[in-house]
Amino acid sequence: MIFTRGARITGAVLCAALAAVTAAWIVRDLLETERPVDLWWFWAGQGEIRAASPPVTSLLDPVLLAVHTVVALTVMRSAVAASALFAAGALTLAVRLPGLWVLGSSWMDGRAPDDLRTRALLCSFGVLAAAVVLIVTALAGRGVPDSAYALTPTRPAQGVAVTAFLLLGAAAGIWAAWEVYWGQRLGLDAYLDRVTGESVLMPLLGTPPGWLNAAIVLLCLAAAVGALFGTPFSRPLGMVAAALLTGLGGAALATALRYEQLDRFGELTTVEQLSLASLLFGLGAGTLALFALARRGEADMPGAGAHGPAWGRPEPQRYGQGGGGFGPPPPSSPPPGW
């Protein structure tokens, strides 16, 4: 099966629109802050920010901007365009879905002007609708190849698949372990607040940490299992999950360098040490997985299955062609006297 041209155009337009919306919110925050670098440290979770109006974006917005931009630019000629659109839609749903209840909740009263909250809520509805259309387009936009040169989905190479499985599988295990830890430490009620965002100070378009970590676990786990079985969707989905890990790990590394946490690593508490080590592992694993999965995939050979050539009756030999068995091929013309 191939991905039709109409579906590719639809996906490219939707991704471009999503990238434009995210870029507009980022530009809005940059214009409201005194210094652009202050917005970066706000994204990294380093305290308050001097701004005429509270920031709306979070660290996930530049990640979304990068994903939507890359997919919009490559979907027209990519062999895994359908999987890329599905992965972009899934990431957008995972990040923006909490806005439906966070922006209209009572605990957000007083954190931002009502008109700003209304604009953010309407924007969230539009973005979620576009994400759903992306997923539907990815699932319904397949067609039958019209030529032997049509772009068909490719699978990750064996070495790439093993690398992605190990890195993303380990990241999923680490992030899941942290959520188990916080669930036991906080108790059920407080942990549910961590998932819904009720007890968390975050920007209007932010994602509750418990919800975000659960999304990272699911994305990494799905990509890791898909890579293990060599499925075409594992490459785009793995790159999306790796982009999340790289973004979070990059912010953690910047914070650690700013406050010299690496130099005084031994002075940190055990939880702080493990948290920093986990985020730095996510940075390394995400970067390596991105580079590995960005390599061109392998196309399926015609008539070949997972364990070699397909079973069945061999094609009859034609005179003048090489044979498939032992011995020399038949001569191109009969010898004299035949």
Language model region names:
Residues 14-28, 91-96, 125-133, 158-184, ...:
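Alpha-helical transmembrane segments of multi-pass integral membrane proteins
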Residues 11-21, 57-60, 64, 84, ...:
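Hydrophobic alpha-helical transmembrane segments of polytopic
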Residues 16-19, 232-235, 241-304:
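C-terminal functional regions that serve as terminal interaction/effector modules
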Residues 1, 299-338:
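Intrinsically disordered, low-complexity Pro/Gly-rich regions
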Residues 111-135, 161-168, 266-291:
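Alpha-helical membrane-associated segments of multi-pass integral membrane proteins
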Residues 1-10, 68-88, 132-163, 218-241, ...:
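Cytoplasmic membrane-interface segments at the C-terminal ends of transmembrane helices
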Residues 25-63, 97-123, 177-215, 251-279:
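Membrane interfacial helix motifs at helix-loop boundaries and amphipathic/re-entrant anchors
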Residues 77, 81-143:
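Hydrophobic, ordered structural segments
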